[in-house]
Amino acid sequence: MPQFNGFKIVPKVQIDDKDVLSLVYTPGVGACCQAIAKNLESAKIYTNKINSVAVVAFDYAAALKRAIFLKSALLIDAYPLVISDETDKNDFKFAIENLEINFCAFDLSLIEDYAKDIDFNVEIPVLKGSVADLKDFFGAISRNVFMLDIKSLKGTVQERSLQLHELSGGAIETELTEEKRNKPVAIVSDGTAVLGFGNIGALASIPVMEGKAALYADFADVDAFPFCVKTQKSEEIVKIVEMFADSFSGIHLEDISAPSCFEVENKLSENLNIPVFHDDQHGTAIIVLAGLLNSLVLTGKEISNIKIVISGAGAAGTAVAKLLHFAGAKNIVMTDINGVVYKGREQNDKYLEELAQITNPSDERGELKDVIKNADVFIGLSKGGILKPEMIKEMEYQPVVFALANPEPEIMPDIAKEAGVYIISTGRSDFENQINNSLAFPGLFKGLLEGKVNKVTDEIKLECALMIASMVEEDELSTDNILPDALDCSVPVQIARVIKEKFGS
């Protein structure tokens, strides 16, 4: 009989080709998000919520022991969560009510005396004391024991993703291990900026978070699970994450809209002694820079001499502009729903005004169609269909277009090529030249954790981008191949290595 000392997160389906990746992650996973947004009860069908239990304790070792027992005895995917015994009970009540969307039950039996007089307003069971037969309490939880043939799924990517998630009951589960492992990473979202759907709520965002967790597990052997919150107030998100921070080895922020995402990341980075990383910002920026560096090799241009137009000044667009500027870009022009971003613009908040200080050096005005003229590079982080063929024809020789809106890019690749684009990339795994964060965040967090690095700096992001770009061999680099394959398992290993070597303690 093995002696279990920990658990790891594992994908329910092995991500071994791009087709499976497109079902577990983008673009297919968006169909699951939309289905849940229309019918919240369907989260029980398309995610692992129905078999996920939170075990709360004052001590991580005690919570872990309980989680191991629940998995070994009842096949329940139990996640240890730790709070301080000095936590205000009203704050704890608020946190539990926000976190219920992730789980089918809370096990508070290890903090029975603390929790017994708290009246939780939740729709799922809360176990406050011991019970004679745990199966009576957890008996309604369904299990998914199956043999799934991916090739048997029929229909579009979206239809097959729905089928896959329904058959597997979500994308992840826990597996007991004999070795001790790092605490997991929390994938935190409020659901305000999910893929290209906008604010569809935290519950509907869970399929994306499970997909991220599956990629962490498969590509980097990093344990992570969804920690989504109902509240959409930045100060409340921070409060909840800080309350449970001792449960985690790192915080991965995902699909939180601007400017809230900046406030949440800044505050958590200041207050916590573990890495905090907003993937929509920095994962995107790293991959865009890597792709741009290799594109410039092909065009023979220098980053300091080109004009870059970025459509979308939200979380991703802001981070991309800042990292490109850090890497040497001198002429970046940003556009958003109000047109070109410039200093002193009436619609600027403090973050856009800060961005205006390092962009638009010629003080251009107007809209996207005005500033795209003579641009060498277009980077779309906005919405589908906004880049028109006639705009491409006004760009410089050998134009580079990164149309990264999901699920519909700013322009479809075939249309872009007909208009004269030299290099076209999208965020989708079903097209060539995918620019996707999945190349960056698994290895980045692996390196941060193994190197005991607690802060993500611009220097780290630049090194990650340089490493990713360098992994496309010179004889393999082409207009249709500017980045390593999304399933290249050597990428996260090399990213982790460079972080540990250059920044590790």
What is the meaning of each model-derived region?
Residues 99, 145-174:
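Amphipathic alpha-helical dimerization/oligomerization modules
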Residues 353-423, 428-430:
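Rossmann-like adenosine-cofactor binding region
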Residues 60-65, 69, 74, 182, ...:
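Glycine-rich phosphate/diphosphate-binding loop of Rossmann-like nucleotide-binding domains
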Residues 1-130, 173-274, 502:
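N-terminal ligand-binding/catalytic initiation module
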Residues 85, 275, 279-280, 299-301, ...:
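Adenosine-phosphate binding glycine-rich loop
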